[in-house]
């Protein structure tokens, strides 16, 4: 069950940059020094989707109830903004490799920002890229993501919102 956390006094890490359409920031819990991601709802074309962040919380609760390996999301207050918060899924020695890096590394002609490439973004394409990098053991995880997205009616699984955790290398 999601809990409410006031993170107003937590330290915002301004040098972290996260992708996506929503306003978000990275904060550090002063009690345990762990990083968390705080997301608010989006405001678009003079429309305010104030309750949009709840979809993250509800998806998290459904995923956990069904036994999927999903992040836990809670409700958070950051100053005068309400949103959702999740603990960082990576440790200090790890980094996220987004799907877009994997796919463009496999096929450098693939241009996800071009509408002409939309039809190329398929399970088969992802599977070929995984096989190319000897990551075929993750095919079952991709299938689980597709099943979970179907259950929660997520139609926004683009290349920048799935990733692999890798050891950080300089």
Regions from the language model: what does each represent?
Residues 89-146:
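ATP-dependent phospho-/nucleotidyl transfer catalytic cores
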């Amino acid at each position: 069950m999601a809990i409410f956390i006031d993170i107003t006094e937590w330290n915002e890490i301004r040098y972290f940059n996260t992708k996506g359409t929503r306003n978000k920031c990275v904060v550090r819990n002063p009690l345990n020094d762990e990083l968390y991601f705080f997301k608010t709802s989006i405001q678009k074309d003079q429309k305010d989707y104030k309750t949009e962040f709840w979809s993250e919380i509800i998806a998290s609760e459904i995923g956990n109830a069904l036994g999927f390996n999903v992040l836990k999301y809670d409700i958070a207050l950051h100053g005068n903004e309400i949103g959702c918060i999740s603990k960082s899924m990576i440790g200090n020695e790890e980094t996220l490799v987004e799907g877009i890096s994997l796919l463009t590394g496999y096929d450098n002609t693939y241009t996800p920002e071009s509408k002409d490439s939309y039809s190329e973004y398929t399970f088969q394409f992802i599977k070929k890229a995984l096989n190319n990098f000897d990551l075929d053991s993750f095919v079952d995880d991709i299938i689980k993501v597709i099943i979970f997205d179907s259950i929660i009616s997520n139609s926004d699984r683009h290349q920048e919102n799935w990733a692999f955790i890798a050891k950080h290398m300089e």
